[in-house]
Amino acid sequence: MKIRANLKKLMCAAVVALPLLSTVTQAAEPIYPNLPAEIQNRLKSSGMSTWGMSAYVQAIGSPRPLISHNAQVARNPASVMKLLTSYVALGTLGPNYRWPIEITTNGSLQGGVLSGNVYIKGYGAPDFDTKALREMLNQLRRKGIHTIQGRLIFDDTFFNGPKIDPGAFDGKPYSSYNAQPDALMFNERRSQFTAARKGNRISVTTSTPAHNLRIVNKIKRAKRSCRVSTSVKRGRGDAVTITFSGYLARRCRNRGFTMAVTDPANTMYSAIKKIWTKELNGRFNAQFMVGATPANVRMIHTHYSKSLAELLPTVVKDSNNVMARQLMRSIGAKRFGAPGTPKKGAEAIDDYLRKQGLNFPELRIENGSGLSRYARISTENISHLLSKAYYGPHRDVWLRSMAVAGVDGTMKGRLRTSAVRGRGFFKTGTLRDVRGIAGYVNAADGRT
């Protein structure tokens, strides 16, 4: 969808949260000094004061906002923060950037037998999954390789940083949205399990096995109950045991679980072994290891991810937290060199914004996804970012990444019957006690 440059746009940003900081810069007086009556009435009916809301609405190119309410108060933007991460990624990495995954060796490759130390090094590809892995392994088979033996060493050193408790945000460490970044990310760390009953037999299976993962099935037969719960126990090293408990009656449908319980390297190793032997009829006798790739290796194959432009709608439109975290560390590595860390990522984002004339003194960014209680930015500065991006060189990619009102992404079920349907391009944000939305709306006479 190409957005024509000559159409008048309205830009809006609104974030609801408890304030923490406020800026003191002088702002232009809004054309409408008060919030519209409809908004005030809605706030009143919800039991919320106008003090708890910030709003900023401005016509693109206009020196004055239409509405400015608590616009300089620093709020928690929730997932609206992904706009900053995406904007800086476009400016630093570029829309055509693709993340490599390298297969190298300092062993031998003779007669189709790849032996010795074989290294798989990741550079933070957000989208590397089973489908991409299968494609990569197919390329090896096409090169005549039929046997992998020795040691398969997984290199995730391109990212680093302090160990983060994935449950620190909300006490749910195994929820897929809390999955932490990894330079060798695989399937967004997601492991999928299915509990099913056929007759008197109850089974628990996984489509994403890992050689360090053990499944314990304690589900019992029942006449009515369909309740199944899980518990996770970590053992020595990287061993993980998941216990499924509860009851399944004959009438129960299959119960599906998606969890972030294993690290990408272990899951990838098991997937490689399965695909190589079961699907590609190859031979596999390689031990699992994790380590850094040495200098004296030769390239066997390089796989490339989809481009940033292709991935950005998943980050923004669908509000993918894992990919946003990957982007932030990639930005940090690009600006300050490897390894990519949260600190480098946050500093790189702030540095790039300043170079674009976007000085946000209240900005606090933790992980690039907005899944944070620490993050802060004002609605006025979100609007300044939107204006800058609209006039920037990547406007079409930027706008295509946003959720269209009433049509797709996080806006698919919102504003479906309003005049804004199909004409609004938004990024939404939701946390406990936080609701936010920012983006663009075509004027009544606008066309797309």
Please annotate each region the language model reported.
Residues 2-12:
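Bacterial N-terminal signal peptides that target proteins for export
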Residues 12-22:
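Bacterial N-terminal signal peptides
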Residues 23-27:
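Sec/Tat signal peptide C-region and signal peptidase I cleavage site
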Residues 28-43, 92-360, 445:
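Conserved serine DD-peptidase/penicillin-binding transpeptidase domain
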Residues 44-69:
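A short, well-structured edge-of-sheet supersecondary motif
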Residues 63, 82-89, 152, 184, ...:
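Residue-level preference for non-acidic, small/hydrophobic
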Residues 65-69, 129, 328-448:
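Small-residue-rich helix-loop
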Residues 68-88, 92:
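Short active-site loop at a secondary-structure junction
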